[in-house]
Amino acid sequence: MQSEAELRSLLSRIDHRGYPAYKDTKGQYRFPGYVLSIDHVQGDPFASPSKVSVLVSGKTAGFPQELYCGKCQRIALQDELLRQFGRRAERFAFKAKGSGKSGLISVSRCGQEVLERTACQIQPENGNILLRMEIGFPANGRTINARELEKILFDFVPECVKASLFYKNLDAKRLRRIVDLAEDQEYIRKELPKRGLCAFVANGSVLPREFGISSRPMRDGIAFQSPKEQEVTLELPHKGKITGMGIRKGITLIVGGGYHGKSTLLKALELGVYNHIAGDGREYVITDATAVKLRAEDGRSIQKTDISMFINDLPNGKDTTSFCTEDASGSTSQAANVIEGIEAGTSMFLIDEDTSATNFMIRDELMQRVIHREMEPITPFIERIRELYENYGISTVIVAGSSGAYFHIADSIIQMDRYVPKDITVLAKKEAENFPQISVPEQPAEKPTYDRVPRPDKAFRGNDRIKMKTMGKESVMINRDTIDLRYLEQIADSEQVAALGYCVRYAQKHLIDGKKNLIQIVDELEEVIQNKSLAELCESTSSVSCMAVPRRQEIFACFDRYRALRLVCYRS
């Protein structure tokens, strides 16, 4: 390890030379209070910025152990430190001049959700803080401008580090509130199954967002108020008593007129699998961590998935116990999404009729009379929903506005009226008595087969030059194969997409052997992430600055949408 004086001397030596001479700076340098590491140097000023990290020892940082002793506390603190550093870095961005990306200083941009990221990591055993950033090394044309880089590394970065990574320079009360909030959120999530609940929405929550693509709360948005019949009161470790709507396990139907807040409530529940920052409005909207949003995905590929619970006796004679297609219909794709969700270990489905295949969701009495059951290969979801709960322990929340077919089987019915929820279970059930109930198959479906084994791909073995590119939250490309993720609505951040790409790449190189099934492979990936770190999947210090931990459900979904993956299904 070299000293900061040696780095300054090195910069002076390479000043005004060709840009490739910046490669000489790669290495570690001891600065007062931290170690600066230049991990990867960009090829030219117009390329992706250089990767730089700082390591502050726990003793120097001085954070009390109770702020990072548990996982939820540590993630909350990491998130806050990253936000603090990012705000400081924005003040200095591009103050160092030059061509291309010269002078850029950036870290991961955190949204409303609190995610575990590779950009800031605290070691629980000693409190050491590792923060990764990207810096555009300055140049005039393609000639090194070392004096401008000196400003960044010796003035701007030290100020950001001292202002955001040293406990003595931060608001201790604010940090305590952030960690307390995380502990309260985690307490609610653990309390849900004990109370027979699958979700909780606190009174006073603000669910509407600022506008369509914004995730920030709407100003003057109507505060949520639970119906009295559904109110639950919890005693939180820090906030104390909190009251809100408890969504009970089973089948819950959300109804109401258009634009009255049905989908807004469902969207809040979708993202309630993550903790949210203070002031978001959804801090105390907590959903079962395994919840999966279901929808139709016309055109997606399906490989060796047992969809016989919903689809059988196809006219072309295709086997639905090991179904394959490169271009699924809406109903077929939604059936596959249900089975894959079960395989991924979900305990809760979230469904909006607006994004569902109608023929998958319901089949009314008139249609059943005209097209007899034996002529219809699709068993609609309404005929399996009770079975999913009683035999698999999977609760379902459905948003519906056009059909009352689910009134008969719902355990709880909530009407959204101008963003205010009302319990209309008794009223709706009484009205439903005047309408015929949809028949349910006498025999439950056979348990789906999940023993899908990926075949190894020789192109990945021993190959360290596998290219990967992400396109926001939409997709990830591995070599020339694009994995379409745009319909996975619970992906909260593009950095989770990057992590999913690395999960697939790591599995192809190290885990897929033609023997392990998909469940075992995802188990091992989670083990690597939990016991080592997400950065371990990269196998390189130059690519670990922009990932966020994805859920198990999205890891499965990514493999399921990877068209280049070849699966074999073994039956006992």
Language-model-derived ranges and their functions:
Residues 1-187, 191-196, 207:
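N-terminal accessory targeting/assembly segments
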Residues 387-393, 399-572:
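Conserved NTP phosphate-binding and transfer environment spanning the P-loop NTPase/kinase superfamily
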Residues 242-274:
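Glycine-rich phosphate-binding P-loop
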